[in-house]
């Protein structure tokens, strides 16, 4: 797993190469409002044209971090000649298109980007493979035994506690009830819920609630 510092160091040292674009690091950790800061300023150059971007860096490529990055960049009071850019380890083609629709540029460590200087140039690159797969404790929570946690939200879209979810899952698991198989543990349920929050499937506030099926 990479860190934000390591990512910004690569940007600072000119190691982010996304032809036909070239990048020049200008500054980092600057205030842009009363309580807002940006991680870096960079120049993106294409042929003889260049544009300046305010970069928000996220070290995890989860839907939650992606959406948080978009929301933060949209909230910044940037000058008219500085444009927002999200920097993540990996950006999928779908995410690049979403950024483009929001008027936000994006670059990653896998060779993908959408960089837009309105009215001057637009560069879209996709297809670079994800070199930073999920480090979640359970690699795919939507398969095999752990998928029962997600299916539990189709029965009840809102739970008070993790214990309630675990009880619902184990009550509906015929292998537990008929064959005395080991019930799902509380720690497994918690790990699955953590990933579901990062994937923006559920939210955990006062209750644990389904956001989208």
What do the predicted segments below correspond to?
Residues 1-31:
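Acidic-basic catalytic patches of nuclease active cores, encompassing PD-(D/E)XK
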Residues 36-77, 85-86:
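Conserved catalytic cores of phosphodiester-cleaving nucleases, focusing on short active-site segments
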Residues 77-103:
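Nucleic-acid nuclease catalytic cores
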Residues 103-115:
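Charged, structured surface patches that assemble and position nucleic-acid processing machinery
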Residues 116-121:
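Short, charged, surface-exposed secondary-structure boundary motifs
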Residues 146-213:
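Loop-centered beta-sheet repeat module
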């Amino acid at each position: 797993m990479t860190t934000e510092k390591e990512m910004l160091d690569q940007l600072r040292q000119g190691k982010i190469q996304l032809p036909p674009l070239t990048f020049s690091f200008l500054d980092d950790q600057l205030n842009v409002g009363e309580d807002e800061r940006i991680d870096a300023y960079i120049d993106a150059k294409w042929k003889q044209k260049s544009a300046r971007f305010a970069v928000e860096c996220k070290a995890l490529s989860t839907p939650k971090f992606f959406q948080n990055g978009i929301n933060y960049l949209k909230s910044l009071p940037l000058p008219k000649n500085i444009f927002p850019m999200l920097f993540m380890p990996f950006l999928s083609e779908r995410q690049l298109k979403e950024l483009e629709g929001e008027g936000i540029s994006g670059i990653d460590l896998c060779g993908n980007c959408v960089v837009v200087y309105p009215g001057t140039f637009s560069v879209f690159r996709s297809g670079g493979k994800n070199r930073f797969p999920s480090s979640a404790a359970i690699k795919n929570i939507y398969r095999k035994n752990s998928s029962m946690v997600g299916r539990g939200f189709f029965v009840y879209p809102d739970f008070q506690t993790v214990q309630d979810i675990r009880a619902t899952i184990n009550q509906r698991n015929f292998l537990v009830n008929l064959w005395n198989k080991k019930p799902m543990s509380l720690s497994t349920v918690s790990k699955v819920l953590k990933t579901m929050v990062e994937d923006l499937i559920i939210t955990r506030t006062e209750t644990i609630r389904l956001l989208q099926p």
